[in-house]
UniProtKB/Swiss-Prot annotation:
It comes from the Bacteria. It comes from Paraburkholderia phytofirmans (strain DSM 17436 / LMG 22146 / PsJN) (Burkholderia phytofirmans). GO terms for cellular component: plasma membrane; proton-transporting ATP synthase complex. The gene is atpC. This is ATP synthase epsilon chain. F-type ATPases have 2 components, CF(1) - the catalytic core - and CF(0) - the membrane proton channel. CF(1) has five subunits: alpha(3), beta(3), gamma(1), delta(1), epsilon(1). CF(0) has three main subunits: a, b and c. Its main location: membrane. It is found in: Cell inner membrane. CDD domains: F1-ATPase_delta (cd12152). It is a peripheral membrane protein.
Amino acid sequence: MATIKVDVVSAEEQIFSGQAKFVALPGEAGELGILPGHTPLITRIRPGAVRIEAENGEEEFVFVAGGILEIQPGAVTVLADTAIRGKDLDEAKAEDARKRAEEALQNTGSNLEYATAQAELAYATAQLAAIQRLRKLRGQN
């Protein structure tokens, strides 16, 4: 089966680099599925889970907090604002962050504080959704 080169990088480190059969991620206008031979594209990505079906059939999961996606004829590059390997996601920390953001929304004094709290809430909610999705795909409840 044909494959495509996939790189997922953040400002801190390279999270994944290898050949893949399929990549799915949250694009700006909805979920994107990428197979080898996909039309070239550059778009923003929303916070959420990136699922990579590697050449050997194993699945890799990465949480991204947004960023840019570039698709070229032989390569997919995800430039993430922040990226966390699926196995490193911490549900308790994400839930705590969600609660803090919700509290901050109730106690904001300025538009900037409100916007910051909204962004933090969106990030935590997306991270929790990615954890739930990963758990479901692994057959755990």
